[in-house]
């Protein structure tokens, strides 16, 4: 499986994402600069965290106009797995691929620490390696991770089982403690916590590794034929 890691001005988690794929999974991965216009030849797309374009105007608001973003939308529409982490999640929201918006954390402070996540849905290609209701430890690093949506959108997320992860505690004011959601089709996941920073016990937790392993396993089950 071959992954693309999108690199934007201000990205700072692209190297971590690259490491998780190449060194922990042993899969192919390449950096793709924001001025590129095609993601042909890639099987999965990773939009990492950081402060794209300085987070001016609004987190992800400028990044959505980058040359590479139509290709990201195309990959999502084609059913390829697309993962947006932290700022990457915010960008996917700005693109309209995922619903909702991010507001300032409820205490107006930047949060940077490991947190408890609860796996709400383990029937996605990102979470199939977990157990439903499983508690995992994954770090967060955000100042604007307070997920917000209106009541109709929330009802739809619940009805369609699109809530992938919730926080064990209300760390930032997110509606229903939402930490990660998928699109209706289930091939796009946006999450504020950083699974790429939790792929080795030396980092304090390896709980994020199952997420990447799930992506690869589901892709192989679909695309690789064994005799």
From Swiss-Prot:
Residues 3-225 form the Glutamine amidotransferase type-1 domain. It is found in: Cytoplasm. Its main location: cytoplasm. It catalyses: N(2)-formyl-N(1)-(5-phospho-beta-D-ribosyl)glycinamide + L-glutamine + ATP + H2O = 2-formamido-N(1)-(5-O-phospho-beta-D-ribosyl)acetamidine + L-glutamate + ADP + phosphate + H(+); L-glutamine + H2O = L-glutamate + NH4(+). InterPro entries: Class_I_gatase-like, PRibForGlyAmidine_synth_PurQ. Pfam families: GATase_5 (PF13507). The active site is at residues 86, 194, 196. Pathway: Purine metabolism; IMP biosynthesis via de novo pathway; 5-amino-1-(5-phospho-D-ribosyl)imidazole from N(2)-formyl-N(1)-(5-phospho-D-ribosyl)glycinamide: step 1/2. GO terms for cellular component: cytoplasm. One of its GO terms (molecular function) is glutaminase activity. Keywords: ATP-binding, Cytoplasm, Glutamine amidotransferase, Hydrolase, Ligase, Nucleotide-binding, Purine biosynthesis. GO terms for biological process: 'de novo' IMP biosynthetic process. Its EC number is 6.3.5.3, 3.5.1.2. The keyword Nucleotide-binding applies. Part of the FGAM synthase complex composed of 1 PurL, 1 PurQ and 2 PurS subunits. PANTHER family: PHOSPHORIBOSYLFORMYLGLYCINAMIDINE SYNTHASE SUBUNIT PURQ (PTHR47552:SF1). NCBIfam families: FGAM_synth_I, PRK03619.1. Part of the phosphoribosylformylglycinamidine synthase complex involved in the purines biosynthetic pathway. Catalyzes the ATP-dependent conversion of formylglycinamide ribonucleotide (FGAR) and glutamine to yield formylglycinamidine ribonucleotide (FGAM) and glutamate. The FGAM synthase complex is composed of three subunits. PurQ produces an ammonia molecule by converting glutamine to glutamate. PurL transfers the ammonia molecule to FGAR to form FGAM in an ATP-dependent manner. This is Phosphoribosylformylglycinamidine synthase subunit PurQ.
């Amino acid at each position: 499986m071959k992954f693309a890691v999108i690199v934007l001005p201000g990205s700072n988690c692209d190297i971590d994402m690259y490491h998780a794929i190449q060194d922990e999974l042993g899969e192919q991965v390449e950096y793709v600069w924001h001025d590129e216009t095609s993601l042909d030849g890639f099987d999965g797309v990773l939009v990492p965290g950081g402060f794209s374009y300085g987070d001016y105007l609004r987190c992800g608001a400028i990044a959505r106009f980058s040359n590479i973003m139509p290709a990201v939308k195309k990959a999502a529409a084609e059913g390829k797995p697309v993962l947006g982490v932290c700022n990457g999640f915010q960008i996917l929201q700005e693109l309209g691929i995922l619903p909702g918006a991010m507001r300032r954390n409820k205490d107006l402070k930047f949060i940077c620490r490991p947190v408890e996540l609860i796996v709400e849905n383990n029937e996605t290609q990102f979470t199939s390696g977990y157990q439903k209701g499983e508690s995992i430890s994954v770090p967060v690093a955000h100042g604007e991770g307070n997920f917000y949506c209106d009541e109709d959108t929330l009802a739809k997320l619940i009805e369609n089982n699109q809530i992938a992860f919730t926080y064990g505690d209300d760390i930032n004011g997110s509606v229903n403690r939402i930490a990660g959601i998928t699109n209706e089709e289930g091939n796009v996941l946006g999450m504020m916590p950083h699974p790429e920073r939790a792929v080795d016990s030396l980092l304090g937790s390896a709980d994020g590794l199952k997420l990447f392993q799930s992506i690869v396993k589901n892709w192989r089950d679909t695309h690789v034929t064994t005799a």
